């Protein structure tokens, strides 16, 4: 199974595509879509939509995961995030991908073993667990979303080895190295695996 994680934003949108092959996790593609900041919001969102559509077309994920909206954001931040989330949901819907939502703490728990992981810890875990080297937390968060969803789907997460596959997105390289998942993190993944999706969208392309 191949899962797409999206960390939406109007200035930067992280994406991570991870495949589960038996007991292996494979980073198919990951990166950050970052339109020029001086462009109008509508144009930035349109470019992100096009970029996500291209990622989906090339990487071929079966399902999509995204973070739930948290209530601590300011009104302005919530409005901007809502616009970016709408673009991410639209990209998934256009490709016929079901969308699953997870709370930020649930994603962090499944990925790092701690529901309060910092941005730096998320980036380090992406390198340790997947061999990826995300330059920004947006990319690490997107990879974490994909891994969290795969954990929930599998019911457990054991990773004796990871490797790359041929599918890629221009300008993005996924790297991996063998790594066994510690028991504590596997228990965290099992907890995340019991989560249920709060949103699904089954619309496909016309």
From Swiss-Prot:
GO terms for biological process: DNA recombination; DNA repair. GO terms for molecular function: crossover junction DNA endonuclease activity; DNA binding; magnesium ion binding. Its EC number is 3.1.21.10. Gene3D superfamilies: Ribonuclease H-like superfamily/Ribonuclease H. InterPro entries: RNaseH-like_sf (IPR012337), RNaseH_sf (IPR036397), X-over_junc_endoDNase_RuvC (IPR002176). The active site is at 7, 67, 138. Belongs to the RuvC family. Homodimer which binds Holliday junction (HJ) DNA. The HJ becomes 2-fold symmetrical on binding to RuvC with unstacked arms; it has a different conformation from HJ DNA in complex with RuvA. In the full resolvosome a probable DNA-RuvA(4)-RuvB(12)-RuvC(2) complex forms which resolves the HJ. Mg(2+) 1 binds at residues 7, 138. One of its GO terms (cellular component) is cytoplasm. CDD domains: RuvC. Its cofactor is Mg(2+). Mg(2+) 2 binds at residue 67. PANTHER family: CROSSOVER JUNCTION ENDODEOXYRIBONUCLEASE RUVC. The RuvA-RuvB-RuvC complex processes Holliday junction (HJ) DNA during genetic recombination and DNA repair. Endonuclease that resolves HJ intermediates. Cleaves cruciform DNA by making single-stranded nicks across the HJ at symmetrical positions within the homologous arms, yielding a 5'-phosphate and a 3'-hydroxyl group; requires a central core of homology in the junction. The consensus cleavage sequence is 5'-(A/T)TT(C/G)-3'. Cleavage occurs on the 3'-side of the TT dinucleotide at the point of strand exchange. This is Crossover junction endodeoxyribonuclease RuvC. It catalyses: Endonucleolytic cleavage at a junction such as a reciprocal single-stranded crossover between two homologous DNA duplexes (Holliday junction). Binds 2 Mg(2+) ion per subunit. It is found in: Cytoplasm. Keywords: Cytoplasm, DNA damage, DNA recombination, DNA repair, DNA-binding, Endonuclease, Hydrolase, Magnesium, Metal-binding, Nuclease. It comes from the Bacteria. Its main location: cytoplasm. SUPFAM superfamilies: Ribonuclease H-like (SSF53098). Transmembrane segments: none annotated.
């Amino acid at each position: 199974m191949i899962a797409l994680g999206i960390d939406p934003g109007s200035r930067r949108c992280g994406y991570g595509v991870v495949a589960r092959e038996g007991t292996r996790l494979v980073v198919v593609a990951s990166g950050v879509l970052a339109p020029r900041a001086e462009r109008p919001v509508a144009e930035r969102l349109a470019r992100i939509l096009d970029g996500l559509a291209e990622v989906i077309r090339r990487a071929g994920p079966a399902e999509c995961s995204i973070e739930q909206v948290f209530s601590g954001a300011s009104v302005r931040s919530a409005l901007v995030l809502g616009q970016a989330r709408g673009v991410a949901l639209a990209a998934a819907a256009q490709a016929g991908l079901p969308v699953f939502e997870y709370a930020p703490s649930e994603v962090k728990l499944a990925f790092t073993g701690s529901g309060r992981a910092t941005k730096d810890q998320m980036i380090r875990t992406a390198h340790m667990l997947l061999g990826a080297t995300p330059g920004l937390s947006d990319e690490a968060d997107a990879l974490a979303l994909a891994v969290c969803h795969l954990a929930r789907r599998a019911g457990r997460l054991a990773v004796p080895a990871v490797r790359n596959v041929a599918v890629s997105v221009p300008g993005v390289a996924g790297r991996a190295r063998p790594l066994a998942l510690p028991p504590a993190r596997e228990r965290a993944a099992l907890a995340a695996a019991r989560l249920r999706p709060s949103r699904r969208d089954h619309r496909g392309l016309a």
